[in-house]
Swiss-Prot record:
Biological process annotations from GO: glycine biosynthetic process from serine; tetrahydrofolate interconversion
Family annotation (PROSITE patterns): SHMT
UniProt keywords, alphabetically: Amino-acid biosynthesis, Cytoplasm, One-carbon metabolism, Pyridoxal phosphate, Transferase
Predominant place of localization: cytoplasm
Family of this protein: Belongs to the SHMT family.
Pathways per UniProt: One-carbon metabolism; tetrahydrofolate interconversion; Amino-acid biosynthesis; glycine biosynthesis; glycine from L-serine: step 1/1
Cofactor list: pyridoxal 5'-phosphate
InterPro entries xrefs: PyrdxlP-dep_Trfase, PyrdxlP-dep_Trfase_major, PyrdxlP-dep_Trfase_small, Ser_HO-MeTrfase, Ser_HO-MeTrfase-like, Ser_HO-MeTrfase_PLP_BS, SHMT-like_dom
Molecular function per GO: glycine hydroxymethyltransferase activity; pyridoxal phosphate binding
Catalytic activity: (6R)-5,10-methylene-5,6,7,8-tetrahydrofolate + glycine + H2O = (6S)-5,6,7,8-tetrahydrofolate + L-serine
Compartments, as annotated in UniProt: Cytoplasm
Listed name of the protein: Serine hydroxymethyltransferase
Length: 416
């Protein structure tokens, strides 16, 4: 029999130390990885609940196991809240991740060997949008589009590629693009060749939910997303769509049993909590601040002489091109890490470096905004980044910036 008094610390001190060290790292470091955020204690409570014990293959009211009456309530709450939050007619909250959601949708709408048209990873896309190392580039004939010399999506190129290759699916969405996507234009292109339009809004789902970034749902046949990142929920995925009974049936069957078995009910409960939090009025204010902070940081690094791809940002992230400074993303990432500023190296368009080295940094503001940073703090942070990059190899600058970072982290704790 288990006791509620059982703890990891009392049984597995090595693991307990790793967890505590990570908690302390999150408090003492500034997090600028665009795909990371801090889940609320309520979300984490749901993920650590007894729902982790329950197997629930199937869907609410149609399970293959007994004893699902309570987890049915949790999943239905998540479904209903997701539909309300995004203005969707259909929601599947079972995908274990964004990639799993994409896999289910792709298998629902495509056959192996079909042509897909997605954004190149090198130009800001995602692995699951047709990268050769991913299932999407192995099972399907992937054609890739990119951005132009101004850092904007080249819609004329997409139309040309669509006309030439006649894809079965056009994919919108990105992992490192800082401008607003014209969903209506992508819909028009897809319609011109009789293709499905699928949008992966994993990075901007929170912005879309709050109405500070255009929603793809009115335009796409299916919309996928993660539930963490800007949504601040648990790690997981979701599929959304407008009313279409035929497609809904395909999506349902391709999530379960097509690509997954039992759903993670503790994670689904965490999604339900996160969607409720996102329906609160202050969530819109949070997302507006996320964008304001990203713009403030981008402006300052440009003022300090750094190149920002596309010249600015209209969402939660921007991409610094370090090529003119003769710096690599790998070296910049490491130097900033020593100053307790966590970023990620990232390829830039036409990057001469390998993906393990890169010529860029991706900067995102969801996590610092959760801490309470506003434009003033974001601007100071941009200055600290530039100070370190301007003085690569000077560890005294790294040490000074680390002290500043530790001080501001104490002023803005994650979990106060």
């Amino acid at each position: 029999m288990f006791s509620r008094d059982m703890t990891i610390a009392g049984y597995d001190p090595e693991l307990a130390a790793a967890i505590e060290d990570e908690r302390q790292r999150q408090e003492d470091h500034i997090e600028l990885i665009a795909s990371e955020n801090y889940a609320s204690p309520r979300v984490m409570e749901a993920q650590g609940s007894v729902l982790t014990n329950k197997y629930a293959e199937g869907y609410p009211g149609k399970r293959y196991y007994g004893g699902c009456e309570h987890v049915d309530v949790a999943e239905q709450l998540a479904i209903d809240r997701a539909k309300q939050l995004f203005g969707a007619d259909y929601a599947n909250v079972q995908p274990h991740s964004g990639s799993q959601a994409n896999a289910a949708v792709f298998h629902a709408l495509l056959k192996p060997g079909d042509t897909i048209l997605g954004m190149s990873l090198d130009h800001g896309g995602h692995l699951t949008h047709g990268a050769k190392v991913n299932f999407s580039g192995k099972l399907f004939n992937a054609v890739q589009y990119g951005i132009n010399d101004d850092g904007q999506i080249d819609y004329d190129e997409i139309q040309r590629l669509a006309t030439e290759h006649q894809p079965k699916m056009v994919i919108g969405g990105f992992s490192a693009y800082s401008q607003v996507v014209d969903w209506a234009r992508l819909r028009q292109i897809a319609d011109s060749v009789g293709a499905y339009l699928v949008v992966d809004m994993a990075h901007i789902a929170g912005l879309v939910a709050a109405g500070v970034y255009p929603s793809p749902i009115p335009h796409a046949d299916a919309v996928t997303s993660t539930t963490h990142k800007t949504l601040r929920g648990p790690r997981g995925g979701i599929i959304l769509a407008r009313s279409n009974p035929d497609l809904e049936k395909k999506f349902q069957s391709l999530v379960f049993p097509g690509t997954q078995g039992g759903p993670l009910m503790h994670a689904i409960a965490g999604k339900a909590v996160a969607f409720k939090e996102a329906l609160e009025p202050d969530f819109k204010q949070y997302q507006e601040q996320v964008v304001a902070n990203a713009r403030a940081m981008a402006r300052r690094v440009i003022e300090r002489g750094y190149n920002v791809v596309s010249g600015g940002t209209d969402n939660h992230l921007f991409l610094m091109d370090l090529t003119p400074k003769n710096l690599t993303g790998k070296d910049a990432d490491a130097a900033l890490g020593r100053a307790n500023i966590t970023v990620n190296k990232n390829t830039v368009p036409n990057d001469p470096q390998s993906p393990f080295v890169t010529s860029g940094l991706r900067i995102g503001t969801p996590a610092i905004t959760t801490r309470g940073f506003k434009e003033a703090e974001a601007t100071r942070l941009a200055d600290w980044i530039c100070d370190v990059l301007d003085n690569m190899g000077d560890e005294s600058v790294v040490e000074r910036v680390r002290g500043e970072v530790e001080q501001i982290c104490r002023e803005f704790p994650v979990y106060g």
